[in-house]
Amino acid sequence: IVNTANDHVVVGTGCDGAVYRAAGYDELLNYRREYIGFVEEGGAFITPGFGLNARYIIHAVSPRFIDGDHGEEEKLRSCYRKSLQLANENGVRSIAFPLISTGGFGYPKEEGLRIAVDEINAFLFESEMDIFLVVFDEKSTRLGEKIYPDLEAYIDLHYVEVANETEYLPDGFGVAQTGRSRNFED
């Protein structure tokens, strides 16, 4: 699987927090501290899957969207490229990506989806792998269905509602382990 990671050794909310909890929070965090450390936005690194039913976790260091004029697109493209390269180098036959940076880091969902599909298609033109793009929220699902009518949706919306209630505070803000808060509006 691919996880959306922070550049510093901290655990965020959303996908990052869910992956750490499922894989084994302390074990994964200690591994990152000991063997990985700081990674620039747009970079990627690989860890064992630990408690997950996955051989590896590929962590894509997600760019924060500012205004589109600070290299965000190239950093986001780099996340997909480097993640796919790591997967290929490690013999991965199938991989699941979240829609990187389109949650708490504020990347516009439509643009993020276009970039994901572009980079995945470019990779598949040269290599063979089963690639799944997993969208979590209803807005991203609707957007995907609009742009790609044959999109296969497989998310229990009740699960999404429960996860949102437990993951994020009622005022719409999520708090990462760093103590920083981020707005999670659509």
Model-derived features: where do they sit?
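Macrodomain-like recognition of ADP-ribose-binding/processing modules
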Residues: I1-D186
